């Protein structure tokens, strides 16, 4: 089952395809399809101006409502304090949101984070109105043949704008969940001013991240950490020099693993409450079953290039001692192949886009060169120094990010349907 961790990474940052649900490629570029003709450019500018005006009115409406309330407590971030003192505010997340709705939510996150849910509801209502309006026009309007190309471009442009807005709404909600947990996201990884050259100068917050998950889910997360850190699990102060690209791959894979774990854990906790768990997922596993489970983990290690690269060539046998039996792992191993594949699939293009863009904001866009022999040229691959404690913090954040992403995707889909499966 944990071979899923390795199979999830199919490109330098994220996998290249979703399940066959008609959603197309999972690898999304940072900017949606654009048009080079001047007419379309004017249309795009007009659409963005209209969206910006709507967001400005929304901000005025929400802040006016907040001012009339005497008893609310504003949980202001350090960024708002910096802004009031005239210094440049620090970003609260690596990815800077670009759409008018995204920038609007960024302001709310900094100044009035408790108003984010209301702001999101407002933005989703506007998205639904826009989508309904376009659907009615498509059904009722008789478009002359000479205008059909322009009409399709307008519709495509609006759809791309809605998708980007939806991505940034999801991202803002994930960031808000980290703020509620009082855990700051790791900033963009850049050359360090630390004398040791280490990039991991951020706060650890490991205990807070661990407490955000159910006991059964954390057992799986601990095993995931054991696969990545190997024998260094007990020596977190050691520093390693490792490819920045590899760290980015591990981070992205861990986000997707967290998404998968939360999805499975949600079903597990429900069946546990209803006392309908399958017999194989209780704690009465035989030693043979436990040995088979450990073998599955060892097989996952041998097929996981990122794990092998970071752990310094530790063998699968070396990892075996770190892997512990887990009720949730036994539960997942009881799935048939079709169910396992379905649970391992990220459901929406928007969620995939967030994973890709957030990872690129953290580690930069990888510059990958393929040699004539078909191998990857690593000469331009930047090396960074990071402690194993810093790597543990990154992985825990990534798994938590994926878990939160599952939560907010489900929450938003209940109000604005966009998940295809």
Swiss-Prot record:
Superkingdom, natural source: Eukaryota
Keywords assigned: Chloroplast, Plastid, Transit peptide
Transit peptide (first-last residue): 1-75
Induction of synthesis: Induced transiently by UV-B, ozone and wounding.
The protein's name in its UniProt record: UV-B-induced protein At3g17800, chloroplastic
Organism expressing this protein natively: Arabidopsis thaliana (Mouse-ear cress)
Entry GO terms, CC: chloroplast
Biased composition (Polar residues): 16-28
Residue numbers spanned by region Disordered: 1-40, 74-95
Subcellular location: Plastid, Chloroplast
Coiled-coil annotated residue ranges, if any: none
Main location group: plastid
InterPro entries noted in UniProt: At3g17800-like, DUF760
Biased composition (Low complexity): 74-88
BP term (GO), one: response to wounding
